[in-house]
């Protein structure tokens, strides 16, 4: 039975949130992709998409089943290397994270790259990755533990979210959240943090509202530009044990999505080569690293914003289960739960459609569109 998600959002029960599944695929783009990392629906219904390893940044047109490349791979103006997230900015512009060049880029409404820049905080020596830019040109970013507490970066897992005014050289701390659970300094094989330990996640809307999903009792908070904070009710969740198979799956995914320095052109960042991802190394990393006993309520993946003001949060699931997403409204209320088909991942949310990434047995990805 084809159950529309929009109907579920309207017909929410006061006592329980309904779980709905996607209906039939509306459209599929025939173009192959390798590693889709960012997606944003444009006002005219086309989709801006970033393929981190292969196609670069492209405009996808479902109506004509076509793909057009924006910019090109490189280190110069209007170029990028390993493009990742795409975030809506005021005025129909888009913020692109250029991971390979350690910078960000601004894509205008004309779908051209107008500017690439590094965000450097006062007194800092390393470029930072901004989550968003508001109408006044101020950057929103997360300060890592090694920078916010350089004397004892592993002492606690609380990190600040700041707003940086580059013109005034002013940094304002807006809130704090629970970050990764870092391990004490010392030699180790692999991760320096406790894998699957609960941590808060956040995002910023184009109008400057900050959404935070708190990991303690799993609830959503909205921080308004005026300073007003709106908190939703806690959401019940299942405690899922972390098995050895879960550990192995995590390590494989981590290596597939990680970078290594000195292997790319001119010593730049590049994907980890296959010889460093053999089964023996994967199992050794899964055995020797520190994992939490239970999975958190939700993953540490990026939050997805809907143009209707909804916030989409990916739930933790058991290995082998299909992806599950919770939907919250602008007040932090839990309004829906959406189950995806197998081998699918939610890429983006549009006004009338959901965009889903389908991955086949060979790791090839295709972009699917479903009606909301």
Regions found by a protein language model. Give the residues of each.
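Sec-dependent signal peptide recognition
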Residues: 1-7
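Eukaryotic scaffold repeat domains enriched in small/polar residues
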Residues: 8-372
């Amino acid at each position: 039975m084809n159950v529309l998600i929009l109907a579920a959002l309207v017909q929410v029960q006061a006592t329980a949130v309904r779980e709905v599944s996607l209906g039939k695929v509306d459209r599929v783009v025939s173009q192959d992709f390798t590693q889709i990392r960012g997606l944003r629906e444009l006002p005219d219904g086309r989709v801006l998409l970033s393929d981190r390893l292969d196609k670069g940044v492209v405009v996808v047109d479902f109506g004509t089943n076509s793909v057009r490349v924006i910019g090109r791979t490189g280190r110069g103006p209007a170029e990028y290397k390993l493009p990742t997230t795409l975030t809506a900015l005021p005025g129909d512009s888009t913020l692109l994270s250029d991971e390979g060049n350690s910078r960000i880029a601004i894509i205008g409404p004309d779908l051209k790259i107008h500017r690439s820049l590094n965000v450097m905080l006062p007194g800092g020596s390393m470029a930072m990755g901004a989550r968003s830019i508001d109408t006044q040109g101020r950057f929103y970013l997360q300060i890592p533990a090694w920078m916010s507490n350089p004397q004892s970066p592993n002492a606690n897992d609380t990190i600040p979210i700041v707003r940086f005014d580059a013109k005034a050289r002013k940094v304002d701390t807006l809130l704090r959240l629970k970050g990764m659970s870092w391990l004490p300094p010392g030699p180790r094989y692999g991760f320096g943090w406790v894998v699957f330990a609960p941590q808060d996640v956040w995002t910023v809307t184009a109008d400057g509202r900050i959404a935070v999903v708190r990991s303690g009792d799993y609830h959503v908070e909205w921080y308004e530009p005026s300073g007003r904070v709106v908190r939703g009710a806690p959401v019940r969740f299942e405690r899922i044990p972390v098995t050895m198979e879960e550990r192995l799956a995590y390590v494989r995914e981590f290596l597939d999505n990680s970078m290594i320095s000195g292997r790319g052109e001119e010593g730049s960042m590049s994907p980890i080569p296959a010889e460093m991802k053999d089964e023996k190394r994967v199992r050794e990393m899964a055995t020797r690293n520190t994992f939490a006993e239970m999975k958190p309520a939700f993953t540490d993946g990026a939050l997805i914003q809907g143009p209707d003001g909804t916030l989409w949060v990916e739930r933790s699931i058991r290995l082998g289960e299909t992806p599950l997403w919770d939907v919250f409204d602008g007040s932090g209320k839990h309004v829906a739960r959406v189950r995806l088909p197998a081998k699918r991942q939610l890429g983006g949310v549009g006004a009338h459609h959901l965009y889903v990434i389908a991955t086949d047995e060979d790791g090839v990805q295709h972009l699917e569109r479903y009606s909301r």
